[in-house]
């Protein structure tokens, strides 16, 4: 189903908005189609501050109302236990919160930015969306990640080349308890490295050691700033390792 047709059939909808490339294009397409939409951003300890700032910036540029819903995800012991299906339990909490808020605002249709490149078999979170009857117009329209980036660039969206970003909880090994301190440490380290010019990277925890995963094109940058990175991250970690299995 083409997006124009989708919004013609669903002219009023709530959009689960993360500030990433996919949900950003979905929100743009809804506005372009003249739909009555509202964006909902759920703020938990799993999202870094820059994601909220990007979401607010784009919603402002599109002139779309956006509501921030605070959610204490760390009070859910099923989530913080960090089981293999943590994403399912987390998404269930997040989208349940959005659906409740959207219902109060009179929206019965809830949308998210899952695209045709996302494999439902590899993403437990998609099961939560199905259980809560969340629609994914980009996926239904057959739009892949590459196509969404191209269309976003044509539309002038600053998110067109924004790297895919998995939540901070993914930096902690499965089965290891997730705590606020571990999340804060990860966000602090990644914010510092982003300031050096790194893009599309991860700081993964290996006990008290930080393992840096970067793109091949950023290896020289890391080596150039090796001593500086080691000294700065050494304030919070006992050691810093560079993963030679590069991203992308």
Tell where the protein language model's regions lie, with residue ranges.
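ATP-dependent adenylation/nucleotidyltransferase module used to activate substrates
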Residues: 1-128, 133-154, 195, 210, ...
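Short, aliphatic-rich beta-strand segments
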Residues: 38, 205-216
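A short, flexible beta-alpha/helix-coil linker loop
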Residues: 74, 173-174, 217-218
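Mid-to-C-terminal catalytic subdomains of enzymes
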Residues: 139-145, 149-193, 197-203
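Charged helix-capping and loop-helix junction motifs
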Residues: 184, 226-227
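C-terminal boundary motif of the adenylate-forming
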Residues: 199-206, 243-247
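Short, conserved charged micro-motifs
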Residues: 218-225
């Amino acid at each position: 189903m083409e997006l124009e047709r989708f919004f013609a059939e669903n002219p009023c909808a709530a959009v689960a908005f993360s500030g990433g490339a996919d949900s950003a294009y979905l929100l743009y397409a809804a506005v372009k189609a003249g739909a009555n939409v509202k964006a909902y951003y759920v703020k938990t300890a799993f999202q870094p501050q820059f994601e909220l700032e990007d979401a607010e910036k784009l919603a402002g540029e599109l002139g779309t109302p956006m509501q921030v819903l605070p959610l204490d995800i760390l009070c859910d012991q099923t989530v913080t236990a960090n089981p293999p299906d943590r994403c399912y339990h987390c998404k269930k909490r997040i989208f349940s919160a959005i659906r409740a808020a959207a219902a109060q605002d009179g929206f019965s249709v809830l949308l998210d930015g899952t695209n045709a490149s996302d494999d439902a078999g590899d993403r437990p979170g998609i099961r939560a969306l199905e259980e809560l009857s969340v629609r994914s117009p980009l996926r239904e329209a057959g739009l892949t990640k590459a196509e969404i980036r191209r269309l976003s660039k044509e539309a002038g969206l600053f998110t067109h080349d924004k790297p895919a970003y998995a939540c901070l909880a993914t930096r902690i090994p499965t089965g290891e308890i997730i705590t606020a301190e571990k999340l804060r440490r990860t966000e602090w380290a990644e914010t510092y490295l982003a300031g050096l010019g790194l893009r599309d990277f991860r700081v993964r925890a290996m006990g008290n050691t930080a393992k840096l995963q970067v793109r091949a094109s950023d290896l020289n940058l890391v080596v150039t700033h090796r001593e500086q990175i080691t000294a700065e991250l050494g304030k919070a970690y006992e050691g810093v390792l560079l993963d030679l299995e590069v991203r992308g």
